[in-house]
Amino acid sequence: KEGLIPLLDKIRAAGRPDLSALEGTYDIDAQKKVQNLLLSYIGFDFDAGGTAESAHPFTATLCRGDIRVTNHYHETHPISSIFSAIHEGGHAIFEQNIDSSLADTAAETVNLMGLHESQSRFYENILGRRPAFWIPIYGKLGGLLPQFKEVPFDTFCRAINDVHPSYIRTEADEVTYCLHIILRYEMEKAIFR
């Protein structure tokens, strides 16, 4: 916390990038196609799972070989569904890659939150926010969301790494996300003293 707050202040003082090129209305069905493109790109096996829409993104393991990824879509904010798809895809890939030799053992249901979140956040933030991740598929993104054809690649990369505090943890950037966790911990600690 002591290091994050001064860093956040420094970033805020530098100003936000111009994100006006991303403004507009984005077709929900097109966003669903983007989700499927991204899930396929990161290795989600559609023969062992599927997708659905929900109010809050989540991944559910119905049984071995049936992992469901859900997402939410905002007509004016496609970046949200893009990163929810990558994040939930990370959860799903983790589940899809539990070795079949572990079937019907306690190890098969290794649903430890730390393991799951490490995988999903690795896909979302370590891979998904790097320009190198997008180079092979950015043109396809523009094919599905025509507005992106007008968005220079560098502008897109700045947009997906923009630091902007949010009241919603799952919509927070990589700097302020940690502050959500710290604040929750401090509140819980104070409640149970």
Describe every region a protein language model picked out.
Residues 9, 59-68, 92-100, 153-162:
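Active-site-adjacent bridging/hinge elements
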Residues 70-75, 99-112:
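Short helix/strand-bridging catalytic loops that position acidic/His residues to coordinate divalent metals
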